[in-house]
C-alpha cells in the first residue's frame, strides 16, 4: 500500500546524508566543534543549547547526553538546554518570544562557555539574539543550520550546515546524526 512511498522517503534521506558526507569540509567542522567543546569543558566551561520546535528537542537531546551519557559510563559534562517552561513563558510574555534564549544567556553565560544552537532556516530571530548575547559574554558559537545557513552562518564561530532546501525534517535528521558523532568524539577526547 505505502511501500513505494516508504522507499522514496528512505532514499531521499539517504541522498541528503550522502550529499552531506561528500563535502569533506563538514567532517572537518564536526571535528573542530568537538574539540572546541572539550576544550571548554577542560577549562571549566559549559554548553548552553537552544533551538525551536524539533531543533529545540535536539538541543535538549544534546544536553541530556552530555549530562547523562551517550555510549560510555563517565562523569557528566556541564550542559543546559534552554528549555525551562517557566523561563520560556515568562520571557515570552514579558519581553517577546524572540528573547527567550538571549535572556537566559545573559543570565548564566560566561566567557569560555559555548552556545550550541540549531536552526534549520538559519534565520530564527530568538536564536540570532542568543548568539548576539553570547558573543557579548565572550562565548563561542557552534551553529547547526540548513538551507543556505541564513543570517546565523555569518555569526557562528563554527557552522555545520545541511544544504537541503525542501524539508526541515531532512535537515534535522542530519543534525541528530551530527550530535551523536559529536558525543562520540567528546567522549573519546575527554577520556584522554
UniProtKB/Swiss-Prot annotation:
It is found in: Cytoplasm. Transmembrane segments: none annotated. The keyword Metal-binding applies. Its EC number is 5.3.1.28. Its main location: cytoplasm. Binds 1 zinc ion per subunit. GO terms for cellular component: cytoplasm. Its cofactor is Zn(2+). SUPFAM superfamilies: SIS domain. One of its GO terms (molecular function) is carbohydrate derivative binding. The reaction produces a racemic mixture of D-glycero-alpha-D-manno-heptose 7-phosphate and D-glycero-beta-D-manno-heptose 7-phosphate. Catalyzes the isomerization of sedoheptulose 7-phosphate in D-glycero-D-manno-heptose 7-phosphate. Belongs to the SIS family. GmhA subfamily. This is Phosphoheptose isomerase.
Amino acid at each position: 500500500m505505502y511501500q513505494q512511498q516508504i522507499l522514496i522517503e528512505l532514499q531521499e534521506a539517504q541522498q541528503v546524508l550522502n550529499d552531506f558526507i561528500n563535502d569533506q569540509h563538514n567532517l572537518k567542522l564536526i571535528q573542530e566543534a568537538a574539540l572546541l567543546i572539550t576544550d571548554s569543558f577542560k577549562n571549566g566551561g559549559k554548553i548552553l543549547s537552544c533551538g525551536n520546535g524539533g531543533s529545540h528537542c535536539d538541543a535538549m537531546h544534546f544536553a541530556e547526553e552530555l549530562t547523562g551519557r551517550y555510549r560510555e559510563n563517565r562523569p557528566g559534562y556541564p550542559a543546559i538546554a534552554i528549555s525551562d517552561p517557566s523561563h520560556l513563558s515568562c520571557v515570552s510574555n514579558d519581553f517577546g518570544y524572540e528573547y527567550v534564549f538571549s535572556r537566559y544567556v545573559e543570565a548564566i553565560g560566561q566567557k569560555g562557555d559555548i552556545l550550541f544552537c540549531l536552526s534549520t532556516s538559519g534565520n530564527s530571530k530568538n536564536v540570532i539574539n542568543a548568539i548576539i548575547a553570547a558573543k557579548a559574554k565572550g562565548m563561542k558559537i557552534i551553529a547547526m543550520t540548513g538551507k543556505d545557513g541564513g543570517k546565523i552562518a555569518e555569526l557562528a564561530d563554527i557552522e555545520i550546515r545541511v544544504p537541503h532546501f525542501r524539508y526541515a525534517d531532512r535537515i534535522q535528521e542530519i543534525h541528530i546524526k551530527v550530535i551523536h558523532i559529536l558525543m562520540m568524539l567528546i567522549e573519546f577526547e575527554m577520556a584522554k
